[in-house]
Amino acid sequence: MTAPLKHSDPVNVDVALGDRAYDIVIGRGVLASLGERVAALRPGVRTAVVTDRTVAKHWLEPTEASLAAAGIPTSRIVVEEGEISKTYAGLEKVSEALIAAKIERNDLVIALGGGVVGDLAGFAAAILRRGVDFVQVPTSLLAQVDSSVGGKTGINSPQGKNLLGAFHQPVLVIADTAVLDTLSPRQFHAGYAEVAKYGVLGDEAFFTWLEKNHSDIFKGGSAREHAIATSCRAKAGIVSRDERETGERALLNLGHTFGHALEAATGFSDRLFHGEGVAIGMTLAAQFSAKLGMIGEADAARVERHLIEAGLPTRLQDIAGFSQEGLADADALMALMAQDKKVKRGKLTFILLEAVGRAVIAKDVEPAPVRDFLKEKLAQKA
């Protein structure tokens, strides 16, 4: 079991959704407060903790201990790590286990893990008995700053990422920054892409701060907590104004139209983590914006330079097995992008840049210039 955590004063970020508002509690050691917070939210509740095998080794026992100390009965559901669980089969396994555990509508599902576990457990909670509340306990940087906030849940289809799902807001998010100490460098760096995204899409001052301080975020301490809290405030603000992604929330998809296609082309495997796909996608979005004359080449280069300095891939050729079927084929990538949730009447919607710190929604983008741009990028030497 992981050594006891050192604590820091928690930071609370409010997701203002009226009677469905909830707190994101950020800090080192806040996992220990899970039980008392759940008991205060829902006296007499029973819980089921959904996690994966890797997270369970480090954080399942401390989670169960916190719940037990508050007198909260719980059961555990452990799935395989990674996108392999974010499938029909994974959803069936978790749903049937929740039914077997007799989780009722007034109980709570607790998602203890990264983005996959949060999406999977949240979707299972959304459909169980037509809706059971859930708590997010994100254990990856990506999940703490992005997927645990805002209520998007779901699974992948063989035809594309996140094509099946529901909006189902958590009732609480516990983001313990100490749990990130157990991530591999590659996992942490992949999550950092989502942190950088908030600066690129809407906060140039934050992006400038990241350029100067990203190495301190990797080390931990106050810089890490500041980056996570700033990211969560940015997302919480957007979600509170546009919960169902009818407008502004689409900006959060910066880098994702390209990125999701690349994830699908690599079979949702560890050849390309989600955050790595976002980093490449964000770079491509900046470069495509420059090609369209929306930003200068210097701005596009600035975005790419920072992502490289943060240890992230930025080129298609950076993907393992780049020459394998589907990845080096512009038409195949276009077909995958055509499955994107933002496609309308066959035309693509992209999040593009007018400046570093100012993203816009570009609707009805014709496929031809995108295809030509991809062919240009695919032709670059490794």
From Swiss-Prot:
Family recorded in the similarity comment: Belongs to the sugar phosphate cyclases superfamily. Dehydroquinate synthase family.
Binding, Zn(2+): E194, H256, H274
Matches recorded under PANTHER family: 3-DEHYDROQUINATE SYNTHASE, 3-DEHYDROQUINATE SYNTHASE, CHLOROPLASTIC
Gene Ontology BP annotations: amino acid biosynthetic process; aromatic amino acid family biosynthetic process; chorismate biosynthetic process
Record keyword Nucleotide-binding present: yes
Reported function: Catalyzes the conversion of 3-deoxy-D-arabino-heptulosonate 7-phosphate (DAHP) to dehydroquinate (DHQ).
Organism of this sequence: Bradyrhizobium diazoefficiens (strain JCM 10833 / BCRC 13528 / IAM 13628 / NBRC 14792 / USDA 110)
Keywords of the record: Amino-acid biosynthesis, Aromatic amino acid biosynthesis, Cobalt, Cytoplasm, Lyase, Metal-binding, NAD, Nucleotide-binding, Zinc
Protein name per Swiss-Prot or TrEMBL: 3-dehydroquinate synthase
Catalytic reactions of this protein: 7-phospho-2-dehydro-3-deoxy-D-arabino-heptonate = 3-dehydroquinate + phosphate
EC annotation from Swiss-Prot or TrEMBL: 4.2.3.4
Cofactor note: Binds 1 divalent metal cation per subunit. Can use either Co(2+) or Zn(2+).
Molecular function GO labels: 3-dehydroquinate synthase activity; metal ion binding; nucleotide binding
Pathway in which the depicted protein is active: Metabolic intermediate biosynthesis; chorismate biosynthesis; chorismate from D-erythrose 4-phosphate and phosphoenolpyruvate: step 2/7
Enzyme class at the top of the EC tree: lyase
